Amino acid sequence: MVRQLLRRSILWMGVLVLGVALPASPAFGQRGAQNGEWRSYGGDAGSTKYSPLDAIDETNVQNLQVAWTWQSVDYDRQAEDPDVRFNSVLLATPLKVGNALFTSTNLGQAAAIDPVTGETLWVYNSLAEGTNAGRGRGTRGLAYWTDGSDERLLLVSGEHLVALGTRTGELYPEFGENGKVDLRQDMGPRLQRYAWNAAPLVCGDVVIVGAAMSDSPTRQEATPGYVRGYDVITGQLRWRFNPVPQPGQAGNETWEDGSWEYSGNANVWTLMSADEELGYVYLPVSTPTNDWYGGHRLGDNLFAESLVTLDCATGERVWHFQMVHHGLWDYDNPAAPILVDITVDGRPIKAVVQVTKQGFTYVFDRVTGEPVWPIVELAVPPSLVPGERASPTQPFPTWPLPFERQGITVNDLIDFTPELRAEAIEILGGYVFGPMFTPPSVRSDDPDETQGTIQLPGWVGGADWNGAAVDPETQILYVPSVTAPIVVALVAPDPDASDFNYVRGAPRSVQGPRGLPLVKPPWGRITAIDLNTGDHLWMVPNGEGIRDHEALQGLDLPKLGTPGRPAPLLTKTLLFIGEGSPSMLAMPRFAGGKMFRAYDKDTGEVLWEMELPAGTTGAPMTYMADGKQYIVVGIGEANRPAEFIALSLP
């Protein structure tokens, strides 16, 4: 049965309760990584990023040291052929199964690594097999499947899905054609090139993949962001979900004037989660074509910018909730939904949690799709762009409270000194600004008039692909986020180059006075939220932030927070997180740092920190090997090799 929540009642003032979570029978929920292993990108299929390991704890964490480093085997291919190029930002998080770590690389290779020494055990050579990633950016990792006797690794390598043996890295010949499935197939005639940089997800005997697509295409006609499920043994396509409903399908009416016929995107570019007990996969769906102007696709545009739940075996939609109607802000759902069992007012609930770029924490019953706390439709500003019609309302969770600053006013501007504040006010005056969901605006040709709309949070979040982590024992969620406004300035394109009425032009970022951020700190933060009550427990800046700017000299400033893309790792007693590599975040300026820290989960106090050779690029993970606990994370920068660094006690 498909649960439909297709259109909301409009609420101009007050509160509209969309649903109350139904009691759920107690069941074994998402418990994090088990048995000292790390079998999924997020530790488990529910993306908790949690391990109950406690050999490293608050009493000895200060003794952590580097155990080994592993340089990406992509450099071996480059040594063989100097023309080989790839990104030095290693996105992957390795899996730990049995006596090996398994990782993907930026050339679409895979490798097995000794978990104690960091020695390479085997390599799947994507260049030799003809499946390498053309732009050398790679994916965030692998998926692992076993039925208890057989086991295999699933990897998106360039435009192919491949199945590899865990012992040797050799292709399974019965999977697809000689071990490979061509992912360009079944994507429709509009596809020019397939790419994806997340990690496959296994649910039962199905491996599920999404797709990456341009946020700023030049044509209205685009490929829909199909999500596909393949048989893990044969590679046969089991199902294909189209996020743009076709005639006769629920939601098609939300694409006015036949815009469903040519519109695309609404893809899943990021990581997914699954409840294998229920047999459900949870899709964080992104924005439709294009991200900033929707005059050619009027309507709510289901199932874009929604959390969509599918049956893993059939691809049938079970329930959905749309977080943004008629998206104009690139507020796609950026992170894997998190599955956790909570208790609210005495009621056990099998929950799914979606953190967003807007700084919201949406919490639903993952069985029924009912919100755990009321979600209200509130009026938002209209669009003044010719041909555009913004949604009159957007859904706002009433609880938990936002974990990021939303919208921008004069009161949000930097105020370290009166001079800096005055300069910030002058800068703000050159733009349209207001509450969150203020639509994009057309840039004036007159430099003394508006130069676009300042959007906060921007397209970098709030939250992003690095997501959040949850402790399934305490039901406390830990969310890293950034405060980084952007500018959305629409311009009329050359009609020979684009058939859109408007596309996004320059400027795209806004600097504050003297190159400092425009808004008050913290610019990078961590927020702890009790999911049983929805209460915020603590918030701390992550990192010192800017310290050497000449305008700040002589000021007694607290920690300002380092904006970045660090992913969290939870253990029994500690929260580990870096600052993110500068290469992971193009804006704001001063983004990223090399510090890696352990926080007290109860208080947010920093218990330990280490300066790494480079900033973190992937999500950290932990495991046991030979009786010792290790923590491994990818690091790298533009001028430094991509590598893993492993930490352990002496």
PLM segments and residue spans:
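Beta-propeller blade signature
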Residues: 169, 223-236, 300-315, 367-368, ...
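Structural motif
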Residues: 167, 218-224, 304, 360-362, ...
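Bacterial N-terminal signal peptides
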Residues: 9-24
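Mature N-terminal segment immediately following signal peptide/propeptide cleavage
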Residues: 31-77, 96
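Phosphate/diphosphate-binding loops
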Residues: 336-385, 636, 646-649
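Extracytoplasmic beta-rich repeat domains
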Residues: 70-93, 123-148, 177-199, 242-271, ...
